[in-house]
Amino acid sequence: VIKNNGDEDTPEEQRQMHTGTGRIATLTMYPMSLYESKESSGEISFLELFDNKSLDIDGITSKLSIEELIMLACRGGWPDSLNVKSERAQLLIAKDYLNKVCEDDISRVDSVQRNPELARLILRSYARNLCTLAKKTAMLADVKVEMETTVQATFDEYVDALKRLFVLEDIDAWCPAIRSATAIRSGKKRCFIDPSIAVAAMGASPKSLE
């Protein structure tokens, strides 16, 4: 990065500054898709499904079995998982990541000390409500079963920290037609950045999900 904000002798408040807007873009990176990890053929394109009305997908099937797909969801899209052969070792990656987030990262993200056990309870509640329109009040009630002193403000603060750590990512409601008179749900779906974190939060395994 080249930086030149003016002569070093110029007072800081008088130097010309540039925020980078229009020249520097931010890019959010996600764990790998099955196509990126070479486990999906990529024969069906999401873009083509929407843009190509004549696209024919009849007869196209995945070469992966249900059991294999479950294992891959539990493993997740972590690049390190491709470097280990043992399925047991692959499953440990998401578990270790979850432990690191709860024990360390959630307090380090903004230098606010947080309770690792409460973080685990919130992640477990999210996992129970994965890809649903569950309300925060319902998830808070779930957490309060084991930690009854938790209040909504604390719950929201932890969720915000977990989103900044790219662990949680709620998905906004999708409206295909802006002018459509059809009533649609506007709530957000409760999701993780990778399904393997939800599996780890629940203490589940490929066998228990089959």
Q: What residues fall within each predicted segment?
A:
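Conserved nucleotide-sensing/catalytic segment adjacent to the nucleotide-binding pocket
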Residues: 1
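Interdomain motor-coupling "hinge/lid" segment immediately C-terminal to the ATP-binding subdomain
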Residues: 4-128, 132
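Accessory nucleic acid-recognition modules appended to NTPase machines
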Residues: 82-210
